[in-house]
Amino acid sequence: MKVAVIILSILVLAAASESIEEYREDFSRPNAMERSANDWIPTAPSAVERSADFAVEELERATCAGQDKPCKETCDCCGERGECVCALSYEGKYRCICRQGYVWIAWYKLASCKK
């Protein structure tokens, strides 16, 4: 019984340390903790998933200089029930992104949409 408790404790510690490491990687960019929720835009999961996705590439290329109007004219959020708005990315550039309320629609949701 004691051996089972020890093994279970080791597994829990291993899982916790992995979660901590992932958290550190997420915030390893400079000034990541200083940014507000509205300034942070998630990136695509991988280059392979993005390579053929016109919708994602279109949104990444679209610059809007802080104005929502160009975004509303050029993107449709790939059928998601959201709105296309202009937001400051972690790169310090304004980009068109899709959001539902205060939640950014993740890039992987846009990956299935091709215009």
From Swiss-Prot:
Designated name of the protein: U2-ctenitoxin-Pn1b
Highest taxon of source: Eukaryota
Domain writeup: The presence of a 'disulfide through disulfide knot' structurally defines this protein as a knottin.
One Pfam match: D_CNTX
GO cellular component: extracellular region
Disulfide bonds, paired cysteine numbers: 64-78, 71-84, 75-113, 77-98, 86-96
Organism encoding this protein: Phoneutria nigriventer
Keyword Signal in annotation: yes
Gene Ontology molecular function, alphabetical: sodium channel regulator activity; toxin activity
Summary of the function given for this chain in its UniProt record: Blocks voltage-gated sodium channels (Nav).
InterPro entries (UniProt xref): CNTX (IPR035285)
Cleaved propeptide residues: 18-61, 115
Signal peptide feature range: 1-17
UniProt keywords, alphabetically: Disulfide bond, Ion channel impairing toxin, Knottin, Neurotoxin, Secreted, Signal, Toxin, Voltage-gated sodium channel impairing toxin
UniProt main location, coarse: secreted
Keyword Disulfide bond among record annotations: yes
Family: Belongs to the neurotoxin 03 (Tx2) family. 04 subfamily.
Localisation: Secreted
Known tissue expression: Expressed by the venom gland.
